[in-house]
A protein has these predicted regions:
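Substrate-binding pocket helix/loop in short-chain dehydrogenase/reductase
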Residues: 90-91, 98-103
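C-terminal helical subdomain
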Residues: 166-169, 173-174, 190-230
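Conserved glycine-rich Rossmann-like NAD(P)H-binding loop of the short-chain dehydrogenase/reductase
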Residues: 29-45
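Active-site helix of classical SDR
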Residues: 114, 149
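Conserved glycine-rich cofactor-binding loop
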Residues: 15-16
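Conserved NAD(P)H cofactor-binding loop of Rossmann-fold oxidoreductase domains
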Residues: 82-87
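Residue(s) in the substrate-gating loop at a strand-loop-helix junction
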Residues: 134
Length: 230
């Protein structure tokens, strides 16, 4: 197993929710964490934990963030693409504004960060990319727009694995169900107590980052309740 000492991991969406829980967990485990957030001032900066502005909707934001992290630390060993949104978009809904925004943030954002970081991940020899997808990326519920973006991020993850495997880069699509964060605050189908806790999921992310090159997980499906597909 790989450890955290000396390894630099970028985490997007790190100012709240799951991204914040992941950043905290990795920092506690000895990783150097580079947090990316629209409001970096919301991140409590400390030794081995920096914060930079990153907006997944802005085309140049990914490159600027990666450059800042690489300049600061001299290396990048992994990415956790966690930034995302989930407005309701049904098949018959008029207008495409919300759908387009989800594609920019949930799909193009992770793609841009990964592209910018690839030279550093390859140089690491043990580069890691963890894309936070969803069980909505494995089966479709009422929010078809969200599911479309999460199916796409699973596809992106497999594309990264295929193209960069021989360079030592490993990628995992993490597919959780309901997580007890502000994104699910309005959900009534599952109680908050029954939802997966972000701190528990963050521990799984740490484990994925510590797996050696010859022990790679392509997809990790995580459910908090009985699912027809699991």
């Amino acid at each position: 197993m790989l450890g955290g000492s000396g390894r630099v991991i970028m985490v997007s969406g790190a100012s709240r929710g799951l991204g914040l829980a992941i950043a905290k967990r990795l920092h506690e485990a000895g990783f150097t964490v580079a947090a990316g957030a629209r409001n970096p001032a919301a991140v409590a900066v400390k030794d081995r934990l920096s914060a930079d502005r990153y907006d997944a909707e802005e085309a140049g934001s990914a490159e600027a963030w990666v450059e800042a992290v690489a300049t600061r630390y001299g290396r990048i060993d992994g990415l956790v693409n966690c930034a995302g949104i989930n407005p309701k978009v049904r098949v018959m809904d008029a207008g495409e504004e919300s759908l387009d925004q989800m594609w920019r943030i949930n799909v193009k954002g992770p793609l841009r960060v990964t592209r910018a970081a690839i030279p550093h991940l390859v140089k690491s020899g043990k580069g890691r990319v963890i894309n936070v997808a969803s069980l909505a990326g494995r089966r479709v519920g009422s929010n078809v727009g969200y599911a479309m973006t999460k199916f796409a991020i699973v596809a992106l993850t497999h594309g990264i694995r295929q193209e960069l495997w021989d360079s030592g880069v490993r990628a995992t699509a993490l597919c959780p169900g309901y997580i007890a964060t502000d994104m699910t605050a309005g959900e009534t189908e599952v109680s908050r107590e029954d939802m997966t806790q972000p701190e528990d999921l963050a521990e799984m992310v740490e484990t994925l980052l510590c797996l050696p090159n010859n022990l790679s997980v392509a997809e990790l499906l995580v459910n908090c309740r009985k699912e027809s597909m699991l």
